[in-house]
UniProtKB/Swiss-Prot annotation:
<keyword id="KW-0808">Transferase</keyword>
<comment type="function">
    <text>Catalyzes carboxymethyl transfer from carboxy-S-adenosyl-L-methionine (Cx-SAM) to 5-hydroxyuridine (ho5U) to form 5-carboxymethoxyuridine (cmo5U) at position 34 in tRNAs.</text>
</comment>
<keyword id="KW-0819">tRNA processing</keyword>
<feature type="binding site">
    <location>
        <position position="197"/>
    </location>
    <ligand>
        <name>carboxy-S-adenosyl-L-methionine</name>
    </ligand>
</feature>
<dbReference type="InterPro" id="IPR029063">
    <property type="entry name" value="SAM-dependent_MTases_sf"/>
</dbReference>
<comment type="similarity">
    <text>Belongs to the class I-like SAM-binding methyltransferase superfamily. CmoB family.</text>
</comment>
<dbReference type="InterPro" id="IPR027555">
    <property type="entry name" value="Mo5U34_MeTrfas-like"/>
</dbReference>
<protein>
    <recommendedName>
        <fullName>tRNA U34 carboxymethyltransferase</fullName>
        <ecNumber>2.5.1.-</ecNumber>
    </recommendedName>
</protein>
<dbReference type="GO" id="GO:0002098">
    <property type="term" value="P:tRNA wobble uridine modification"/>
</dbReference>
<comment type="subunit">
    <text>Homotetramer.</text>
</comment>
<feature type="binding site">
    <location>
        <begin position="181"/>
        <end position="182"/>
    </location>
    <ligand>
        <name>carboxy-S-adenosyl-L-methionine</name>
    </ligand>
</feature>
<feature type="binding site">
    <location>
        <position position="201"/>
    </location>
    <ligand>
        <name>carboxy-S-adenosyl-L-methionine</name>
    </ligand>
</feature>
<feature type="binding site">
    <location>
        <position position="131"/>
    </location>
    <ligand>
        <name>carboxy-S-adenosyl-L-methionine</name>
    </ligand>
</feature>
<feature type="binding site">
    <location>
        <position position="106"/>
    </location>
    <ligand>
        <name>carboxy-S-adenosyl-L-methionine</name>
    </ligand>
</feature>
<feature type="binding site">
    <location>
        <position position="111"/>
    </location>
    <ligand>
        <name>carboxy-S-adenosyl-L-methionine</name>
    </ligand>
</feature>
<dbReference type="GO" id="GO:0016765">
    <property type="term" value="F:transferase activity, transferring alkyl or aryl (other than methyl) groups"/>
</dbReference>
<dbReference type="Pfam" id="PF08003">
    <property type="entry name" value="Methyltransf_9"/>
</dbReference>
Length: 324
């Protein structure tokens, strides 16, 4: 694990953040190796797999393809299937891994298809993906040949999914750190593009989060923000009393005008909403590759336009803005 994190640190390069970042990564490596039970279990499973060399990969497909069935023996195929199932829940995808279709909870390819046409070219850019999960979007970004595509994923099981996939893909410009955004040392103006998707509604202080994102971007850099929003054109936000769609950690759902005001106050300009989409069962659904509930369980069974708590059903907006 330390080698992987060291490589990420080297890819980021030198700067005033280097000492603090190296110290933090050493501590995170120790936690993943010695303390976190899930990470130790998943690392042991990875180490039991033979070294598999994929003869094929396709990052441009909606379903990312790694290897073919012919790359494995029958015994290796069963062992790989069992290992992949042990890494559940698979949230972001989908994938085809050596002929094994991993049908993830989210059809992340649908979100990417909605957002990608509106992005500034990613080639040669330093990119940050906050809450990168298994790295699906990082892998889609890699197809554009950025200088660096760096993910932040603090949840050890999801970070270990990234480690497993990168073990086969070996994408040199793609890296991931097991950190929360607020743990990242100050790196003023380092990134050209930041993706912050499906995270803002989990922030107790969205304004502070947006200010930090602005500080990490160079002037003129691009923020790609996707979040749950409240339907309507008034400048207001919903603060759920307890849970929203069975999630305890949802703090604010702004309308799009309210979100645009937040972005303006945090130091962004040229703010444009490029997509508003109600979450559908096609995009988020239960599959054998998760062992948790999914969207049908979060909605009122007698009225799918409402959550189980009676709030508006999930509506997501994608907003792109430039740092002033």
């Amino acid at each position: 694990m330390i080698e992987l994190l060291s490589a990420a640190g080297q890819a980021i390069g030198n700067g005033p953040w280097q000492t603090a970042l190296n110290t933090l990564l050493n501590e995170k490596s120790r936690q993943l190796t010695d303390v976190d039970g899930n990470a130790r279990r998943l690392t042991a499973l990875m180490n039991q797999l033979p070294d598999l060399l994929p003869s094929h990969r396709n990052l441009a497909s909606g379903r990312i393809e790694i290897g073919t069935p012919e790359d494995l023996t029958e015994t290796q195929h069963q062992a790989l299937y069992d290992t992949l199932m042990a890494f559940r829940p698979w949230r972001k995808g989908p994938f085809n891994i050596f002929g094994i279709p991993v049908d993830t909870e989210w059809r992340s390819d649908l979100k990417w298809a909605r957002i990608a046409p509106h992005l500034a070219p990613l080639q040669g850019r330093r990119i940050l993906d906050v809450g990168s999960s298994c790295g699906y979007y990082l892998m889609r970004m890699a197809e554009a040949n950025p200088q660096l595509a760096l993910g932040l994923e603090p949840y050890p099981p999801l970070f270990c999914q990234y480690v497993l996939l990168q073990r086969w893909l070996k994408l040199p410009q793609v890296h991931c750190l097991p950190l929360k955004l607020e743990e990242l040392p100050p790196m003023d103006g380092y990134f050209d593009t930041i993706f912050h998707m499906g995270v803002l509604y989990h922030q107790r202080s969205p304004h502070e989060a947006l200010k930090q994102l602005a500080s990490l971007l160079r002037p003129g850099g691009e923020l790609v923000l996707e979040t749950l929003v409240l339907d309507g054109d008034q400048d207001l936000a919903l603060c759920p009393r307890d849970r929203y769609a069975k999630m305890r950690n949802v703090f604010f759902l702004p309308t799009v005008p309210c979100l645009e005001a937040w972005l303006n106050k945090a130091g962004f300009e040229d703010i444009r909403c490029v997509d508003r989409s109600w979450t559908t069962i096609e995009e988020q659904h239960p599959t054998p590759w998760i062992n948790t509930e999914s969207l049908p369980d979060f909605l009122d069974p007698s009225d799918p336009t409402r959550t189980i708590e009676g709030y508006q059903a999930p509506l997501r907006a994608a907003v792109i803005a430039r740092r002033r």
